[in-house]
Amino acid sequence: MREIELWTAVLAGVVQGITEWLPISSEGQATMTMMKVLGIPPSTAMDLALWLHAGTLLAVLLRFGVPYWLTVRDLLMGGPWRRLGLFAIVATVCTAVVGLPVYKVLKGIFSAATGDAVQMAIGGALIVTGLLLRISPEGLRDRREVNVVDAVIVGLGQGFSVIPGISRSGTTMALLLWRRFDGGEAVWLSFYLAGPAMLGATALELKEGLSAATKMGTSWMVTAIGVSFVVSLICMEVLLRVARRLDFSKVCLLLGGIALLVPLAAKML
């Protein structure tokens, strides 16, 4: 692999590994990065962005391995983790019901879109996410109090995060805060739901993702996924520790504003 190719793979992995856990769209930022840095067409960049979820999926399975194991055990045998397991199942089903048709429609739109139009769409979606986070009231519920209504609301919202620019973690956090969950609990639950969501996203685009990965080369994809895995582990741990101190909404609004203004400024020059 040439040096420039290695550098771009590392960049894509770092962007995916960081943005997956912030309420800014990992798919949107990864898509934008690959379009602008590598000159990849929008639809191909979108395929690769979804495929990079493999690295973050491995990271969340490692970090949340014990909670997932306890969930499966209690779903089968009964126990305190059974409620969380049912919450995850209902939320994931609702995500699939919304996400699959939205993604199929979106794919055709993005295939015909220009790079600047995609970037501006991403910016607008990021601003919406930021506004949602700013208006969401924070409460005192914890993970032991999740119910079916929470699962349906969060799952349906999560389904729209297949759109580049709509943040999965930002959407789930905002909805959980709106449902009056504590901020730290909202972050934990958002990460907990990430495993099933990423597994579905990776499976959704497996064929197209492999085709796009073949164009980039095996070494490029392995490097990008590996970097994404390592960076994801670090970011998850940091965010779980300082969740109550971060103002995610300002990050979304700032990046969304940049994504909207840069193409407009370029046209004026």
Swiss-Prot record:
Keywords linked to the UniProt accession: Cell membrane, Hydrolase, Membrane, Transmembrane, Transmembrane helix
Top-rank taxon, per record: Archaea
Intracellular or extracellular location(s): Cell membrane
Topology of this chain in the membrane: Multi-pass membrane protein
GO CC field: plasma membrane
Catalytic activity: di-trans,octa-cis-undecaprenyl diphosphate + H2O = di-trans,octa-cis-undecaprenyl phosphate + phosphate + H(+)
This protein's name: Undecaprenyl-diphosphatase
Species in which this protein is naturally found: Methanopyrus kandleri (strain AV19 / DSM 6324 / JCM 9639 / NBRC 100938)
Lineage of source species: Archaea, Methanobacteriati, Methanobacteriota, Methanomada group, Methanopyri
